[in-house]
Amino acid sequence: MIVTTTPSVEGHQIATYHGIVTGEAILGANVIRDLFAGITDFIGGRSGAYEKELGRARETALSEMEQAARAKGANAVVGVDLDYEVINNMLMVSASGTAVTIA
């Protein structure tokens, strides 16, 4: 499946629009507290453990979005946007885009 932040896929024509698809992942309060407690793991001002957890959350959100697109019969997602938001000491990563079939 092609997943892109652009509104189209170069060299392909969009044949069908299937609508908006989303995926979310939430890191709970314990994960965030543990990550901040592990600040001793800083290397060059960056926390490897925190970045790893964010990466996992991002991949989960993107994977859920792709599954939603497949369920609608799409073979690509265009206009993808990733958002990060803190809600009640939890970090939510959400991915959204438009499911399409490209020729």
From Swiss-Prot:
A Pfam family per the record: YbjQ_1
Name of this chain's protein: UPF0145 protein Rsph17025_2361
Family named by the database record: Belongs to the UPF0145 family.
PANTHER family: UPF0145 PROTEIN YBJQ
InterPro entries, alphabetized: UPF0145_dom_sf (IPR035439), UPF0145_YbjQ-like (IPR002765)
Source superkingdom: Bacteria
SUPFAM superfamilies named among the record's database cross-references: YbjQ-like
